[in-house]
């Protein structure tokens, strides 16, 4: 929630600025404006979190200069985990080193892991009024990427600032980790954090005031307000520019036989990989981000209402495919660690690994591939294919027109309209409760049980089947690419002299599933998918390590 006290949030005045809740603009009471010179700062809040509402200034009348902007992205901890799962190589023939164990040294003295650079790139560091994707030519975009990267790697002020940002991000990581240990879905932990971290990050990057920790905008929120680099075709342009720059640095490192320059190439590539990973977040795949800002008056209202489509696609996910023929269901921001996103996790980690491998290969060979041959691009969700085979998008392009789903509350409504207006659409969306898409699977209501006499081994084995440990199980329903959330966990079974149990797994009696995914959790660890079984199986023997 906002850092404003209740009475402040109702209406604050300071130097001809009035801070008020956006919903008050549409109430009978309205918002009192004392003079022609007053400016109104609206905080869009209500039951939604301000993480997706970035307040700014607008004149009192609707229709001009709305600056309540969405921040739409994978969360920082998610980006960190993706990057730090990568293997980095420095010596030909030697095995890769887990990225979380490697410090990448930057010119300004910062030493960061690959995942930390992925997390900081684009969201926290960049040039707010110079999106990479808006460069007119590949050379222009490469130059813009370099300037964005240098704001982290070269500017002296970034050395201390980045450490403060990462310290706050650790709260997010800790909350997600605790949710995993508790057997909860991590998106619940992100939701519970609300805006508290955004407020801290805004202040760290030069924003905030006595009236609101979110206003004025620091660099963090300015980047969020102009974030086309993180969406669809524009994220693709940003990644290609950054990967190109990193490959050029790797070739230079080869020429000089300088491992320190290879470190810099890896850091540049990690910054670029931020935009690569965004393309695996469902809320970033088909949202017409720039077009909405262009056709809605005021343009910033168009940016604001993209939040609703972003949230829909992130929550329910999209069926996606890539050039290699892989098909999977991808979810979005805050759901990377959720049990239902396991297939997407595999795909995004593989893409980032391919991206990093290409840096080392260019370091060894002294030559760089052309953009048409970048290996990670073959793994990306096909942006055009994702426009079909999914529930009806809230907004969709038809030529140069942005069409809106006719019934905003019905995700299965295929009818679209072109005579919609920004403000009236916002009023429909701000409290809407969309239904569930066709094919949605409800979670099971029962848990697996362990057969009392079904233990398969009396021999302990590393790393988890050990006396003093404990294990429990849950399962989800599946049907093609669709999967439900997991149902309740069984009680922990203490391990002493018996290991590797036989499970009774409840069958589906009405959800329309064709199979089930079985999950296991050792005490203190995170849930893991251990098996997929058909709809008729009633038992499973856990012989997994």
Outline where the language-model segments fall.
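N-terminal, motif-rich segments that launch catalysis or mediate targeting to/interaction with membranes
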Residues: 3-30, 34-46, 53-267, 285-438
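Hydrophobic beta-strand residues in large extracellular and virion-surface proteins
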Residues: 33, 42, 50, 501-503, ...
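Short, surface-exposed beta-strand-loop junctions and turns on beta-sheet-rich folds
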Residues: 48-49, 525
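Short, solvent-exposed secondary-structure capping/transition elements
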Residues: 154, 278-286, 527
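Active-site alpha-helical segments that house and flank conserved acidic catalytic motifs
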Residues: 265-282
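Disordered, low-complexity "stalk" and linker segments at domain junctions of extracellular
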Residues: 437-545
